[in-house]
Amino acid sequence: MLAVKQHGFGGREQLSTCELPRPTPKEGFVLVRVAAVSIHAGDHHMLTGRPYITRLVGLNEIPGMDFSGVVEEIGPGVANFAAGDEVFGTTDTAGGAFAEYVSAPAKNIVRKPATVSWEEAACLPTSGMTALQALRLGSPVRSGQRVLINGASSGVGTFAVQLAKSMGAHVTGVCSTQNVEMVRSLGADVVVDYRTESVEAAAKADSESYDKIIDLAGRYGWRQLLMPRGSLVAVALPESECIPCVLCSIVCSPCCCCCLSQQKSHALMQAVTPADMEELAGMVTDGNLRVVLGLQLSGINEVPDALAGHSETTGQGHRKGKTVISFAAKPETMTRG
């Protein structure tokens, strides 16, 4: 099979496209012929090996996590899928998705609704689940609460804006100039262009603080913007070469103050949850969630440049929606329902 191979940690120079043996699904796994893949921040960290703590996972020969496709073969002990099923899911940190075939744990995939495209489905697993779980972590968002999303134009951010609105929240999105209108189109009540206005100034203009802040960029100190009982969910990992520093950023609150404070902070460790993926796909089917497809490419040979380019723009904070690659060689069944 044709696959993307990663030779080491770094940039584009560590990626190539070559022929590799097609995997055989082991017990509890499913072999999927890939229709589309998406790229997210985790792929960036696994390519660059930064922060260094990500290197503890090890180097995956084939990178990539999130995919959609058709079940080709099931491994021993798999009873809930059969050859021909249209599915989407993730390999999580095990990688392997950037190939014509991927072997993934059956517990990490769900059926794709006919009305959800291959490209949309491939974008849902990690980014969609991260957004949903961030909004539910600690004290779940309730109707009427004020939520700020830093990094609102990113893959996770575009989901988070819409999901927070669906929960009845008043949403402020923070993004760069070129993405302001897009974030507003997703339903954000207030959009702050961090290039021209500080978030602090925008909050003062509103004369309000926030019940929950979702930080997808890791660039501000948020304590002064939280309500007395507000909470911060930190999703972004700092690009630090110091493993203790990264661990401290996870364990220690970016907004922690004295022990008397009732403000809470959480470092999100996203968990693969099939029920969340099914919920997200259902919202897309019902027209209540839009997958923002930013860069759309076709063919596995596009993956190395797309992954390297995603890493560059992620570091610069300029993400716009999801990067998705459709694979040219699709089974005849791979048409949108």
PLM features: residue spans?
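Glycine-rich beta-strand-centered segment in the early N-terminal region that forms part
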Residues: 21-38, 50-94, 216
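NAD(P)H dinucleotide-binding glycine-rich loop of Rossmann-like/cofactor-binding domains
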Residues: 45, 65, 73, 80, ...
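Local beta-strand N-terminus motif with an aromatic residue
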Residues: 84, 99, 144, 188, ...
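Short glycine-centered segments of the SAM/dcSAM-binding site in methyltransferase folds
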Residues: 86, 146, 230-232
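Short, glycine/polar-rich helix-capping loops at beta-to-alpha or helix-loop-helix junctions
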Residues: 97-99, 176-182, 277
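Mid-domain Rossmann-like dinucleotide-binding core that forms the NAD(H)/NADP(H) cofactor-binding site
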Residues: 122-196
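Glycine-rich cofactor phosphate-binding loops and adjacent beta1-alpha1 units
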Residues: 172, 190-265, 333
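C-terminal hydrophobic helical "lid"/dimerization subdomain
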Residues: 271-337
